[in-house]
Design a protein with these regions (language model features):
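Extended non-globular C-terminal regions
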Residues: 240-414
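Acidic, polar low-complexity linker/tail segments
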Residues: 16-40, 47-51, 406-414
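Von Willebrand factor
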Residues: 77-125, 132-136, 159-168
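…and closely analogous acidic/polar surface helices at protein-protein or active-site interfaces
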Residues: 27-29, 36-37, 47-77, 139-151
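Extracytoplasmic/secreted cell-surface and envelope-processing proteins
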Residues: 20-24, 49-54, 87-93, 132-141, ...
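Eukaryote-biased recognition of electropositive, low-complexity segments
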Residues: 156-278, 283
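Sec-dependent N-terminal signal peptides
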Residues: 4-13
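Positively charged n-region of N-terminal signal peptides that target proteins for export
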Residues: 1-4, 18
Length: 414
């Protein structure tokens, strides 16, 4: 009985130590990754695509029906469709007919109709030559912006230069027909494209697997528009040159969030971290002189986190000359100007490229041609106005969402 009484006293005394404070759930977006999802693959069945099937040399295009089905089949069901102006389902193994010229009979193509039909819970892959008028493509980008970018989904384009012998339509101001043969010259190969739309993890995973499965020597370009240019996890970073912050765990947050206390509320506080930029496949080149910081601070008020109207948080990326992809990120703030004294404060910092700081990949410009109306100026190894088409797609992302390079989240305990 005495031992039990003594244990009760010890537990009571131990419970009278430092009080664990509780805070509402941290306002972070939930990252959900579905293990399975369906894939919808759409083949452009217009006559201008026929030429990709006629020359067997280094022909990636004729491998696509089986290759795409194989790459996507492990994640869930794979559904095949053909399209011109309308969309039609391909039952059974009829999708394999798209390796032969005979099925390419459609006169009009409408990528916009495919985007409108696309199921945002699926991965959608559109196989096309991106031969769209400015007006048609403007409608496509509008649909993608409203349906995918506004829903925080990801869009990618894969370009593959392929042997080609056939007709190309609507060339120049006179909308002329153009006969083109690449023969067996890789420098004359004509590009076709995969337009890929869906959840961020699904799109990035597809790009990785497609890149790994590329065995032919055909030139291939990748273009990715994602809100997450880096998967770096700040909670795992080692801090250096820490001023007026100390590690704290009185709030007992989960491992995703770093927690700090302040030595003195009246003094400036700062820290630095090393960060290595590891871009995903297809990420646009970045001008690191054109990045900007968005800082938000939320203070606990009862059961809620309320945003503070003003703060002086500063975050700077400093280039480390020892390695091209290595940076120092310095974060600083003045507690009296940024934090609510005596309350828990959640600090969310996003470092993002500006619209001009996110550049088109070099291959996009190299594969693009402008035709001023003279058919003689057309180059069948390139795509008309490709840089303008993909540039407008990039710009449309910035109208609804901002891609981030690095996100730094931490809580300052009272």
């Amino acid at each position: 009985m005495k031992k039990i009484f003594l244990l009760a006293i010890i537990l009571l005394v131990g419970g009278c130590g430092q009080k664990i404070q509780s805070v509402p759930p941290i306002p972070l977006p939930n990252k959900t990754f579905a293990e399975t999802f369906d894939t919808d693959i759409y083949f452009d069945a217009t006559v201008s695509m026929r030429g990709f099937t006629t020359n067997p040399t280094n022909n990636v295009y004729v491998t696509l029906p089986d290759l795409l089905g194989d790459l996507c089949g492990n994640a869930g069901a794979v559904n095949f469709f053909g399209f011109g102006e309308q969309i039609f389902e391909l039952n059974g193994r009829s999708y394999r007919q798209f390796t032969t010229p005979e099925v390419y009979v459609e006169a009009i193509t409408s990528v916009a109709n495919v985007v409108e039909r696309a199921d945002t819970s699926h991965l959608s892959i559109i196989v096309t030559d991106l031969f769209e008028s400015d007006a048609d493509w403007s409608f496509v980008t509008k649909k993608i912006r409203e349906k995918f970018f506004a829903a925080h989904l990801t869009v990618a384009v894969v370009g593959i230069r392929n042997s080609f012998a056939g007709e190309i339509f609507d060339v120049g101001l006179s909308a002329a027909k153009f006969n083109y043969n690449s023969f067996d010259d890789p420098n004359r190969y004509r590009p076709f494209y995969l337009l890929i739309l869906g959840r961020d993890d699904a799109v990035k995973n597809f790009l990785r697997k497609f890149n790994e499965r590329q065995t032919l020597p055909n030139d291939t370009g990748y273009f990715l528009l994602t809100e997450n240019l880096s998967d770096a996890d700040f909670s795992t970073f080692e801090l250096s040159e820490v001023e007026n912050f100390y590690s704290d765990d009185t709030l007992q947050l989960d491992g995703r969030i770093k927690e700090f206390g302040l030595d003195n509320f009246a003094d400036a506080a700062s820290f630095m971290v090393n960060w290595t930029y590891e871009p995903p496949i297809g990420a646009c080149p970045i001008d690191f002189a054109q990045v900007e910081t968005l800082a938000e601070i939320f203070s606990v008020d009862g059961e809620n986190w309320l945003p503070r109207e003003q703060n002086d948080v500063r975050a700077a990326l400093l280039k480390d000359d020892r390695q091209s992809d290595l940076f120092l990120a310095k974060v600083s703030l003045t507690p009296e100007k940024s934090l609510s004294e005596g309350k828990a404060n959640f600090v969310r910092i996003k470092i993002s490229p500006t619209e001009n700081g996110l550049r088109l990949p070099a291959w996009v410009e190299a594969w693009s041609v402008n035709v001023d109306g003279a058919i003689k100026n057309f180059d069948g190894s390139k795509t008309i106005n490709l840089s303008r088409l993909l540039g407008s797609l990039k710009n449309s992302q910035f109208e609804t969402s901002r891609p981030k390079l690095l996100e730094i989240n931490f809580v300052v305990a009272p």
